[in-house]
Amino acid sequence: MKIIIVCYPTFGGSGVLATELGHQLAANGHSVHFIAYEKPVRLKDNDETIFYHKVNVPFYPLFNFQPYELALSTKIVDVAKKNSVDLIHVHYAIPHAYAAYMAQKMLKMNSINLPIITTLHGTDITLVGKHPFYKSAVKFSIEKSNIVTSVSQSLKNDTHEFFDTQKEIEVIPNFVDIKKFDNQLQKCSSQDSKMTITHVSNFRPVKNIRTLIKIFSILSGKFDCKFNLIGEGPELEIARSMSEDLQIKNIYFLGNTNEVEKVLCHSDIFILPSKTESFGLAALEAMASKNAIVSSNSGGLPELNLDNITGFTCDYNNIQGFVS
């Protein structure tokens, strides 16, 4: 098959999952065309089965905000026509599913009928989708998609509740390439005697970064341990400032990386105290790296991290619970 994948190109879970899915589809003999405003950070295009198409948004002074959705719809139509595409798979409802629906209608005018699969990832429903400015558009996009999938049962339930829709939603959990993590573990030889605790995120407020730093502060005073923080985002500087004010020892801000497995293989514990988390792909990557998981019990995390089995869970604001 020839498949279009539309996703965000960033380090967030939806973009990473979409990219890894494309790689696996290509490995199984399909041609995959990625469409985004930048090349996805983990994408390895090969000019044979994986292709990247950039969405360019022309600047017009008339527009206060440039119309990305229109440019995306047009790019989907262009790629579909030129490559005889069979399927459109969009990750994150807004604006991708909305733009795909418009592209689908334009293609029908040329007697081209392409189905749309929309995968819901979390904040497209729990944050963006709940906003009154976007709620109607999100509901419309979901109901007009041919197939809708969700990364967790929790997110499926939230979608039905928030949007009062009866649209059938299939739960397909996120995945990782176990072979990649196993190969890295075999190469990994850490001589560090310190217990290493790692956090990976985009440092948005929903990731509960301030609580995370407070947890690190208490642990730093009790144990000889090291803290690795991977990622960048709006609360990164707050985290740096708090760690300095609290005089946390052995805390390292490592920035973004395309090879998270090379850091996680040196880690013992992975912590994710998110206020809400529809799946928690970073936690799954940490599991593949043989980390014990300590996470909040929010959203879909309890479906992934089973308390007292794969790790431990507690309320996201329970600092002492995380420390224990």
Residues covered by each model-derived region:
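N-terminal subdomain of nucleotide-sugar transferases
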Residues: 1-41
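Aromatic "clamp/platform" in nucleotide-sugar-dependent glycosyltransferases that forms part
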Residues: 256, 275
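Conserved donor-binding/catalytic core segment of Leloir-type glycosyltransferases
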Residues: 149, 191-207, 213-216, 228
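An amphipathic, basic-hydrophobic alpha-helix
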Residues: 61-87, 97-102, 132-136, 140
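Short hydrophobic beta-strand element within catalytic cores of glycosyltransferases
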Residues: 292-295, 305
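Conserved acidic donor-binding segment of nucleotide-sugar-dependent glycosyltransferases
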Residues: 307-308, 312-319
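Carbohydrate-associated surface elements
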Residues: 154, 175
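Nucleotide-sugar donor phosphate/pyrophosphate-binding loop at the beta->alpha transition
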Residues: 71, 108-117, 123-141, 178
